[in-house]
Structures are given as structure tokens and as C-alpha cells.
Amino acid sequence: MLILLSCAKTMSDVSKTKTPLTTFPGFRKEAAEVALQMSQFSVEELERLLKVNPKIAVENYRRYQAFHSEGTRELPALLAYTGIVFKRVHPQDFSEEDFCYAQDHLRLTSFCYGLLRPLDMIRPYRLEGDVRLPEPGNRTMFDYWKPILTDRFIADIKKAGGVLCNLASDEMRGLFDWKRVEKEVRVITPEFHVWKNGKLATVVVYTKMSRGEMTRYILKNRIESVEQLKTFAWEGFEFNEQLSDETKYVFTNGKTE
């Protein structure tokens, strides 16, 4: 089973956690070109393109200016992203065996680096999928990466057993030819809902936390089959057989009213 997670907007370049090995990103040349083009934008342009406040725009202007410098600090991707999902994965207590297993069974999307393994060394950046780069062809990041990533992604899923546990946000499908992915491998997309006033509701923070907890559960317990995936339970979330189907696994918290 291969897990797919979305990258986070927040990143760090400092960690005390040691990993058994580090690797180069598979698309580091493309990432370098993306970062080079991003470095041509002014602070004001980054503020508009990234939809951020001036402080964050300045921070990322500096990041892109330093991206190609030898002294710029790097971290393994799984430690570099610091959003809610990654806090719940909590790789800080992973064993060497956990990291090695994750390297083969987890992939992270990235608008800058394309597709990452957990131990791929990356530099801090911020980028959105709808940003258009002048070269080549003024395309969005989705259009840029789709023809590059799809074959590699499918090959990685097949190598990991032919089943994808898609815990990424919906927009990340745009980085791949998703119809091809669904045609060539089995895709399971877990959903997490709470009952509120007798109806199912989606709470974003719970969804993010649950995605991280499920990723941790799969990696720590070496989950390989879709049946084993149904055993995931956390903070009242349990598999709901009635609401699920072959491609959508629904986990609900609480009871109907």
C-alpha cells in the first residue's frame, strides 16, 4: 500500500530528529528550475501570487533568493513540513525501521518538487498550484507537473502493492492524470465525518488530524491490505460500513441523533 499526503504550507529547516539515510528528490532538476523562476518575482508579486500577507511574502522572497545557495539548509521532507497533518504523523519518534518503511510506502505532493519520498532532502519554499510560470508556456503548476509525475506515481504504487490510500486533498489529483491512476491501480480515499444535528458534517481540522493519524497508523503497523485499513480508529472515528463503498472508506465520529 502507498499513502499519498499533501504538502503543507508551513515548513521548517531545523530538526533534532535523526534519520537512517537521506535521498535526493527524484525531480530536483525540475524543482531547481521552478525555484529559479519563482526567484524572479518581487515581494509584491509573491504576495499576490501566493495570496499571503507582506511578512510571509518577504520570507518566501528570501527563501527563493537563497534556494540555489550551497549554505541553504535542507531537511528530509517528512520533517520539513510542519502542518497539522505532519504533526499528527509525528515522525520525531520513528525508529530507523519506520523511516525505511515510510520511504517505500509514503509519497508527498509538492508544487515545487513534484513528488517526494519522506527522506528526500528539500529546502523551504511556498508555492500554490494555480501559480503560472513564464516558462514553459505560462502553465499552472498542475499543468506543469501532470505529464512529468503520472508514470512515476503509478510505478511507485504498483511497487508498493498496487493499492493507493489517498489521504491528500482533492486538489492534488490535478498533479496527475487521475483517470489513468484509477484505471491502473486500486485507489481508496478515506473520508472523515462527524455527526451534527443528525447530519454528517466535515470539520477541516478533524480531517487533517485524522489523515495524519491514519498515516502514522499505517506506517507504524505496516498495514498492507484494504481490510486492515478498516481497523483504524482514533478519537471516536471508526469505519462506517454502511456509508462506505469500494473506493471510498468513510470513518465517522459519534452517533446519529
Curated annotation (Swiss-Prot):
GO BP term, example: response to hydroperoxide
Superkingdom as given in the UniProt entry: Bacteria
GO cellular component, one term: cytosol
Coiled-coil parts of chain: none
InterPro entries: YaaA (IPR005583)
Family recorded in the similarity comment: Belongs to the UPF0246 family.
Name used for this protein in its record: UPF0246 protein BF3795
Native organism: Bacteroides fragilis (strain ATCC 25285 / DSM 2151 / CCUG 4856 / JCM 11019 / LMG 10263 / NCTC 9343 / Onslow / VPI 2553 / EN-2)
Upper classification of the organism: Bacteria, Pseudomonadati, Bacteroidota, Bacteroidia, Bacteroidales
